Amino acid sequence: MLPKYEEAGAKYYTHDGKGISDVLTFFKDEGMNAMRVRLFVDPKKQTTNNGKWETDYNVCQDLDWVKALGKRIKDKGMKFMLDFHYSDTWADPGKQWTPAAWASLDDNALAQKLYSYTKDALAQLKAAGAEPDMIQTGNEISYGMMWGQPTDAGSKLKRCWPSSPADNWTRFTNLLKQATKACREECPDAKIILHVERTSVSQQNDNKNHSALSNFYKKMKEASIDYDIIGLSYYPYFHGAISELEGAIDLLKKDYADKSVMVVEFGYPYAWAVGGTTYDYTKTYPYSDAGQKAITADVVTMLKKHENVNGLFWWWPEYNAMGTNLSGWYNAPLFDSYTGKATSALTELCKFGSSSTDINATIMNGKQEADNNYYTLSGQRVSTPSHGVYIHKGRKESKK
């Protein structure tokens, strides 16, 4: 949404109150090295869950928009993650509506349309100087994607719940195969991400013992879906304690050791509760600048213990109504809409991708000795080193 805020005259400042002339440059200087941008098929045809036409100011990212913003990101020397929504509006576990222009297609034709659309979009991005480095083939697709239209009867919708018919899952994986095929053909160096949000065992009833999460990636493996990275959403106010996210990561590391994990959506308020909050974490992390900073620091610390985790993205970090006529309703970005200042959490977030190491050293008898833990070359501590090169007692060691 950054171009919208720039056009509206939003005022951005550092945490110390110095003016920011270029937000992307500021993000990079602070330590961010990648940006994530969503893509809708035709946001002019967006509808509500009742099938009625609506205008959501925030649903505006068509291909031309993404080409322009993606090029800005690449020109800054940052990595670009493209988030295909494969819908005209928001896609998440509660709604995965088929684009209106594709509504009449049967399953085979829909799969072919998905392939051609994905391939063409990527070709246009490349031609515009905005080739993505990472590609999400769908957004929060825990329950499948392109179910049908919001006006369809519930029984007609092709949802993929754990209990859904096998035919629904087959249809879904056939769609994914066409999407990933297009990605490999057009952007062979890009990493493909499968993004879900079943990270909670306490707040998501179908995910006790992470059963829904496990079922999803089991289905992907059975269908031989081609991908590189497991993408997760984690919003503490919806998903519960940090330990729940860590439990999901532990399970994925055990069952899918060949896949990297990224938290592609994360956020926490600096002020009041986000609408629909189901988990109150405020005794530990109050809704304040300090509370937002503290939970971000603790999430980063936890993630850096896991060598299979290689990405952390804040959702909607640039939101800022300061100096505009826009609503200041959203209170979980990395800028305060009352002051325009960057929140303290931004600095903590950037520590995840910093080049500095968390390797500890101790002073014993006047002599410095490295600790006995193993670390990746980026400084992330690992519990049990597997194949690769690690730092141990201040030296590089190769594990075969």
Language model region names:
Residues 11, 154-156, 247, 251-258, ...:
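Aromatic-rich peripheral "rim/lid" segments of glycoside hydrolase catalytic domains that contact
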Residues 107-108, 115, 119, 123-133, ...:
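Structural recognition of alpha->loop->beta junctions
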Residues 23-24, 170, 185-192, 199, ...:
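Glycoside hydrolase catalytic-domain groove-lining segments
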Residues 27, 83, 135, 230, ...:
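Conserved, mostly hydrophobic/aromatic
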Residues 358-400:
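C-terminal outer-membrane/trafficking sorting elements
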